[in-house]
Amino acid sequence: MIKVKTESIQKMLNKAVKVCSLDKFSPLTILTEVKIEGGYLSITTTDTRTTFQIKEKVETTDEMRVVVDVQLLTSLVNKITTPKIGFDMNGNALVIEGNGLYYLDIGIDESGEVIKFPEIKEPAGNGTEIDFKELTRRLEIAKSSIPASFDAKEMNNYYLAAQIIASDAFKVSSVPNIESLKAKELFISRELGNILMSLGIEKGKLDYVSETNTLTIFDNDYIIQSVIGQDRENYPLEAIQSMLSSSFTYNADISKKELLDILDRALLFIKDFDRNGINLTFKKDRLSIASVEETVQEDIKYSKASVDGLVEFNALVDIKNLKEQLDVLPDDNITIFFGDNDRAIKMVQKDIIQITALLED
């Protein structure tokens, strides 16, 4: 019986399970590999495109490798209250000793062997030091423009270069990349982005092999390896960059909090047949917000504006899209650019750009 600290394996499993897509049509995604070898306990999970492994030193010379149901193991381990948990094998079962004895079926392939997980290859180089806490903060802002559906596969990605860009048919987000990644060009899936955001990684290294599109993120106790770049050839980067550089005639500064408060109230009056539409009417000294049927009307005064020659400019936008893009902005003051552009309005906060498309009347 191999003994492991309960708290340690709880933390490891609670991280590892976040990588699983739990797709019943893809068996590996509902399983985890638990391996004890060379004095280390390692736990591995995958969504088939991204594989994650976390390890910790343990005081044993015994070795073991099993593959079991990840949700069952995680739920069980989280409910065990003994200081240590024991692991052993009995035929095709993993025996766990905690408050009692528990038997979990071991995953076996057609040849009768324990199921194999994707091999994680050692990074090709030393990697680039990355501040993942700051990177994920910026990804969370860009996430506000990731499509709600998975239909347009190429759009369900983040483009990372000098800027982190995300877009769907109605929204674009552009956030400056962290300095250590600005010279690289990466195209990562929304799933990998979600994994990085959910794991709460603060530091580590990044290695990218362009020939195989293999991205490896690693530190002393974990490694994430993913194949990236799928659908890059279909990604409309030039069109998105053109939208980001679009010119507008006017701009005005307003309070994000005031605008969000109004939108929260206005949302109560939005009906299904309104297509989530909300009218933003830019006037010389204020922004007027009204529902399509004008059952709600409120104004915000500009704190600063450049509106010479403006009479009035009306923009019908999706209220939910607008709220999502505003919610993630870190500060209160925003500059909205509008006018002489029948496609969109642009919201800027320092070096963050959020673009919301106009709806047809």
Feature locations, PLM:
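Structural preference for solvent-exposed beta-strand-turn elements
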Residues: M1-D361
